Amino acid sequence: MNELDIDETFLDVIKPALEKSRKENIPVISMKIGRKIITGKQTNILSPAGSLILNAMKELTKIPDDIDLLSPNILEPMLNLKHELKTGNRLTLPEILTALSICSTTNPIVEKAINNLKKIKGCEAHATYIVDNGDKKTLKNLKINLTCEPEYMVNDEYNFE
């Protein structure tokens, strides 16, 4: 962005991501759906991209925030395996979409939310960090236009300056 002389007002999604990231000192991605800005932040079990897409699916399907789309019966074994194999402690976006597809076989609300994913095609998003390749590829496959700050996460740690 600096090279192109672009600031946080260039896209509507940049400023909300930066503000939330600075406030909470965690990586954040924001995305504009229609006129609304949706954010996803890193949690103990989700990548920011995964959190963003779950929040977007809830918004598009009108699912309240307190309703979980991912079943604990699916999440727990996945997280346990990641821990055992030392492949991280958060689910990536591709892993979350896989878990959602499994949950959709027994939960029609999740199935409807998955069907609404096509509505995010062409949306603008901004990350406060350099998104890892797996999440970035999946966001690209979902046809989301992504910009990123030049901040790396090192060893799953994030220091936003």
Q: Can you name each region flagged by the protein language model?
A:
Residues 1, 5, 16-23, 65-161:
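C-terminal binding/interaction regions
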Residues 8-12:
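Positively charged, low-complexity intrinsically disordered leader regions
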Residues 44-61:
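A short, polar/charged loop-to-alpha-helix boundary motif
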Residues 28-32:
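Short beta-strand scaffold segments in enzyme catalytic cores
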Residues 38-39:
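Generic structural signal for well-ordered beta-strand positions
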Residues 2, 6, 42-45:
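Generic alpha-helical structural element
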